[in-house]
């Protein structure tokens, strides 16, 4: 199985089963949909109005080279193992701990309703968190590496319990031959030097919530009194990113119908010095004014194309792609 598409003047072919990605010329690109169902002579006839027989013959040689190298039209070698894989004993490998059902921001698109999840505002107790870690260990089977994300609401509103649970997890590692990877997700309002020092020592990853340009961020992520949070959090996020040597963190933004030009927000975050960036579409009920609509899809695709075109000049990580800044 192959998947073909064009982007920024490139003819791109992905071999689905091997994961190989090829940049090919136009002749090869046009031949590939015909290649497995037609003979070479039939292809020459079908494409004779566009290419010469020699061009098609040369392209066929290139296709055969890729096939013989095992990177084009490859078989799915895992298909026969799929059912056995599904029958394997299941284990729990990760937890997202809602350590705080409360928040100090009032983000307009928040599915947690200012952190309370349509319930009452409260903070997770140490005892509940401890039992959650015990559950994870007890149900992790032979898996050694376990993951826990401190989430909310805003986790820093329950910071002491976060620290206590990390300490408990470290104790349990030794007893059960496990290794915890802790992650902290924060809006940055309560971020300070003490939190940074602890996070740099204990958190394998830190997720920093920011939507991009000041006017975009402040519109969607105000504090409870209606004031924007951009100016408060940006210097802290920059300091944390540098203190982690621009690794093992990422700034996480959400784009809505209010900023369908979200490539500008990605580039803005890169200009602020962030090298690990993820900006994702909002998840919202269709009747929300900021919700993306089907008619917005072409504009959204165009923004991704713009970001792809910036690959050689901007450094950011998005959907698994790390793009290095060129000197």
Model-derived segments and their meaning:
Residues 1-35:
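Acidic, low-complexity/disordered tracts enriched in E/D and polar residues
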Residues 38-49:
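Short acidic, hydrophobic short linear motifs in intrinsically disordered regions
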Residues 50-51, 57-197, 202:
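Conserved alpha-helical substructure of the radical SAM core
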Residues 95, 148, 182-184, 206-208, ...:
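Hydrophobic faces of well-ordered beta-strands that scaffold small-molecule active sites
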Residues 115-116, 155-157, 188-193, 205-227, ...:
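Conserved radical SAM core fold
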Residues 131-134, 160, 164-171, 194-197, ...:
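Alpha-helical scaffolding segments of alpha/beta enzyme cores, especially the outer helices
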Residues 201-206, 273-275:
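Glycine-enriched alpha-helix->loop->beta-strand junction motifs that scaffold or abut catalytic
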Residues 219-231, 238, 242-327:
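Radical SAM enzyme [4Fe-4S]-AdoMet core and its adjacent flexible, acidic
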């Amino acid at each position: 199985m192959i998947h073909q598409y064009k982007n920024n003047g490139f003819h791109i072919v992905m071999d689905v089963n091997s994961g190989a990605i090829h940049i090919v010329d136009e002749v090869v690109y046009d031949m590939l949909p015909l290649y497995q169902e037609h003979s070479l002579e039939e292809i020459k006839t079908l494409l004779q109005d566009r290419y010469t027989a020699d061009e098609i013959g040369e392209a066929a040689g290139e296709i055969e080279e890729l096939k013989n190298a095992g990177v084009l039209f490859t078989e799915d070698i895992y298909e026969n193992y799929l059912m056995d894989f599904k029958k394997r004993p299941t284990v729990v490998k990760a937890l997202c701990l809602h350590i705080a059902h409360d928040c100090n921001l009032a983000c307009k698109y928040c599915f947690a309703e200012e952190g309370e999840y349509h319930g009452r505002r409260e903070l997770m107790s140490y005892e509940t968190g401890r039992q959650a870690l015990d559950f994870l260990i007890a149900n992790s089977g032979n898996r050694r590496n376990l993951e826990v994300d401190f989430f909310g609401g805003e986790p820093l509103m329950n910071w002491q319990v976060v620290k206590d649970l990390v300490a408990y997890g470290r104790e349990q590692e030794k007893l059960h031959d496990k290794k915890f990877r802790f992650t902290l997700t924060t809006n940055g309002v309560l971020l300070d030097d003490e939190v940074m020092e602890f996070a740099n020592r204990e958190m394998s990853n830190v997720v920093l919530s920011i939507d991009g340009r000041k006017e975009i961020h402040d519109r969607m992520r105000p504090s409870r009194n209606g004031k924007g949070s951009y100016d408060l959090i940006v210097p802290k996020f920059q300091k944390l990113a540098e203190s982690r040597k621009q690794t093992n963190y990422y700034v996480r933004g959400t784009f809505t119908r209010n900023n369908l030009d979200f490539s500008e927000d990605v580039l803005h975050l890169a200009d602020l010095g962030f090298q690990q960036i993820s900006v994702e579409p909002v998840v919202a009920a269709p009747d929300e004014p900021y919700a993306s609509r089907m008619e917005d899809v072409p504009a959204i695709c165009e923004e991704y194309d713009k970001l792809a075109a910036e690959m050689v000049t901007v450094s950011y990580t998005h959907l698994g792609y790390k793009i290095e800044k060129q000197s």
